[in-house]
Structures are given as C-alpha cells and as structure tokens.
C-alpha cells in the first residue's frame, strides 16, 4: 500500500533527513501478520531502530542520537508497545482501539493511571 510506496520513495530519493515512527502495537498483525517488520524496512533501504515504546529513556536516547545527515539513509523507529498498557481493562484488548469508556470504566482508567 501507500506506506511501502512511501518507504520506497524515501530511500530512492536518499531522504536522510526523514524519520518515520511506527507505533508497533501488534493490533494490525492480528488481522494481517507482517513477518520480520524490521527486515522489510531494511529491504527498502532504511536504517532501522527497534525500541520498547513504553521506555522513556529509550525514546529519549533514540531522538537525542538521531542524525539527520541528508546524505544518509532515511530512518525508521519501530516502537514496540502494548495498546492500552497500564490499565487492566484496556491492556492488550483490541476493542479499546475504538471504544469509548462508560463512566464506570473511565473511573477505573483514571484510578489505575493515578489521574
């Protein structure tokens, strides 16, 4: 689709100042698995970094070390994470991708996130 067409263009045009961020929460993989996502981006000519998308220190390290040399490859950050992490009723449950909490659920969410 359009993502892979864009990935191809980014590498072919040598857009070294381009950085894509993939919210890799595995929700789409349940419907259409992608084998070796890192290898797929590499095959398009991108520099790939994989981090724990829940780790503030890994995110800060990635962005502070990011080099936007226009003569280098474009970069992609695969941020592995779990949808709804940190809340018992939402963590890993795909329905929360589009669901609105009712009042009771909202109170549970606020309590578990210390809000």
Language model features with spans:
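Glycine-rich ThDP/TPP pyrophosphate-binding loop and its adjacent helix/strand module
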Residues: 1-115
């Amino acid at each position: 689709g359009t993502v892979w067409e864009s990935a191809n263009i980014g590498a072919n045009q040598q857009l070294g100042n381009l950085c894509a961020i993939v919210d890799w929460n595995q929700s789409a993989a349940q419907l259409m698995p992608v084998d070796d996502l890192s290898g797929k981006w590499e095959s398009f000519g991108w520099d790939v970094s994989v981090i724990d998308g829940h780790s503030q220190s890994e995110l800060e390290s990635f962005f502070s070390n990011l080099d936007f040399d226009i003569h280098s490859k474009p970069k992609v950050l695969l941020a592995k994470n779990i949808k709804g992490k940190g809340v018992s009723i939402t963590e890993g449950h795909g329905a929360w991708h589009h669901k609105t909490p009712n009042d009771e659920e909202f109170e549970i969410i606020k309590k578990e996130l210390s809000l």
